[in-house]
């Protein structure tokens, strides 16, 4: 935002080689110490300023057409609150207790129950849980492309481990499962994958970006 308000962007160049020893993709940002009215190299969405080459900004603007965001749809996005190895004394095999859902429990977009070789890691926890439907996302990579592995949690009492991302409404919605299904359908949209490759590359998507930047097609 400061750059946009105080400087003129001369050019943004994507570098094809990796930066020294980090193997990170890099760009060259060329700015001039004066302000001119030009928005060829950036756009604004949800109070964020997105930078890119002129070609990429044009593509991003096209991908945002007829889209919304989870934030605009009145959803919050956060990570699960349970760090399992910090509450080992509360974990149990007792199936009458609250189900603790780990990232590895989401397989092929369905909830499974994994048996762990680590005996301290158990599938249930002696805490009060939640019962309302919840959409969880396990961020991952597959065949060089960023992929979502997601699942709607419902009809059980649960808590979520901190390696999963949770999407939930800020206020109660009667048709919440139907709305979750529409969000999932948006994740499956080819335009979503195109946006992710263009904007995020192979970088991790944080909760703020998922909530306020990723376009949702519903």
What are the functions of these language-model segments?
Residues 1-81, 85:
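Signature of N6-adenine DNA methyltransferases within the class I
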Residues 63-218:
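Polybasic, glycine- and aromatic-enriched phosphate-binding surface used to engage nucleic acids
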